[in-house]
């Protein structure tokens, strides 16, 4: 979906396909047929943006076989789909029964992360629509925080500088500008937008910036205006924003709230949980840890890294951080010029929701994704953007 900003620039809205992950190219093609095109049809649009997640095997198949890449591009066009952004965070296995900490490997101190991201950039350059010259890729925020020392930090910094050089060369070759964005996430070396400033300014290249995930920002209790102002003052570009909402519990000390939260403690994904105290942010690596005894202070609200559907907040006594998303979006695209032109709805946890909230089959999932995109579209038009055909 494309929108015209009042300044005349085009803002792209997509949804991320990691909600129905596929490990192979054949799986990606099936995904377009079974999921993405049905969402487009529900929206009644001739064109729908998708943020592709390409696992390592799918990416390698595309980067080593020009015919396969052309075939994917043709299939996208045939189904009324377009790609201007990729989710390069998970490397493989995102559809596994247990993902948890595995999603953080390989990290940016491992040469394979550089090679995978460079391959994604080459693929994206070949998938961009003819009238689009800029693409974006979101990626791991350096590494999970443990066992990350000065030596690994220097290796990661060197890898990002090397990537920037390769992206320069890619534009010289293809005429397509691809940029890569670190996506701050609770528990990682770069947990917040403020944490991103030092490593990104150390890299010192405008092709390497930040992806603002509104669920992650909310989970860390960041104030949107302050976070985005700090990035602007530091000269860190917002390359992409993922529109998502976290799980919010206003009164976590109450037994009924604990019971409601427990329904979201599931074995597949990591649900980092945070609370803001007078001594600073406190947290646990997972929701079940927070619910166990007194691992986390409960005098104030808790927020958990569980991407809940944008249009359907959990029932009381829980809610979502949708107001934070709205504030971030207002700051990003509600001003005289957009701070980013790539927006991606990312709710990958539909099948991890409590059983009674999960979609039953492909049709209900497509309905839900279409409803999320409709909400995002309405937020954008309320900010003065006009949807393009």
Predicted regions: what is each one?
Residues 1-126, 135, 359-389:
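N-terminal pre-domain/capping segments
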Residues 1-5, 97-210:
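Active-site acidic/histidine proton-transfer and metal-coordination neighborhood
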Residues 11-18, 46-52, 83-88, 133-139, ...:
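Hydrophobic faces of well-ordered beta-strands that scaffold small-molecule active sites
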Residues 21-30, 54-68, 145, 187-191, ...:
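Acidic-and-aromatic substrate-binding clefts and catalytic sites of carbohydrate-active enzymes
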Residues 41-44, 75-80, 123-132, 166-178, ...:
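A structural motif corresponding to the C-terminal end of an alpha-helix
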Residues 90-99, 138-147, 215-221, 242-265, ...:
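Flexible glycine/acidic-rich beta-alpha junction loops that bind and position SAM and/or redox cofactors
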Residues 166-288, 299, 308:
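Acidic/histidine-rich catalytic cores of soluble enzymes
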Residues 287-385:
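Flexible, acidic glycine-rich loops studded with aromatic residues
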């Amino acid at each position: 979906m494309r929108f015209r900003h009042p300044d005349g620039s085009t803002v792209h809205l997509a949804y991320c396909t990691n909600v129905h992950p596929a490990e192979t190219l054949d799986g990606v093609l099936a995904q377009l047929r079974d999921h993405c095109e049905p969402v487009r049809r529900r929206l009644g649009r001739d064109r729908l943006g998708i943020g592709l997640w390409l696992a390592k095997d799918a990416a390698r198949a595309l980067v080593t076989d020009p015919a396969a890449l052309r075939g994917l591009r043709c299939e996208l066009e045939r189904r009324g789909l377009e790609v201007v952004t990729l989710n390069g965070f998970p490397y493989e296995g995102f559809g596994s029964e247990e993902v948890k900490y595995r999603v953080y490997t390989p990290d940016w101190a491992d040469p394979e992360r550089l090679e995978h991201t460079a391959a994604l950039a080459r693929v994206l350059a070949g998938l961009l629509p003819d009238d689009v010259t800029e693409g974006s890729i979101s990626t791991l925020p350096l590494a999970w925080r443990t066992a990350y020392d000065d030596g690994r930090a220097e290796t990661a910094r060197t890898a990002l500088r090397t990537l920037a050089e390769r992206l320069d060369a890619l534009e010289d070759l293809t005429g397509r500008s691809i940029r890569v964005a670190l996506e701050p996430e609770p528990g990682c070396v770069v947990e917040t937008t403020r944490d991103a400033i030092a490593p990104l300014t150390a890299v010192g290249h405008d092709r390497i910036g930040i992806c603002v995930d509104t669920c992650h920002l909310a989970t860390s209790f960041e104030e949107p205006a302050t976070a985005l102002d700090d990035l602007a003052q530091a000269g860190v570009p917002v390359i992409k924003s993922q529109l998502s909402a976290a799980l919010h519990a206003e009164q976590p000390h109450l037994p009924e709230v604990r019971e409601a939260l427990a329904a979201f403690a599931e074995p597949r994904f990591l649900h980092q949980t945070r609370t803001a105290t007078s001594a600073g942010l406190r947290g646990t690596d997972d929701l079940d840890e927070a619910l166990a005894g007194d691992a986390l202070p409960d005098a104030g609200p808790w927020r958990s890294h569980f991407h809940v559907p944008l249009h359907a907040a959990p029932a009381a006594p829980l809610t979502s951080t949708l107001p934070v998303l709205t504030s971030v979006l207002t700051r990003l695209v509600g001003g005289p010029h957009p701070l980013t032109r790539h927006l991606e709805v990312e709710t990958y946890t539909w099948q991890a929701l409590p059983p009674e909230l999960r979609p039953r089959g492909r049709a209900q999932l497509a309905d839900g994704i279409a409803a999320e995109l409709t909400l995002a579209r309405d937020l954008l038009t309320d900010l003065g953007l006009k949807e393009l055909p």
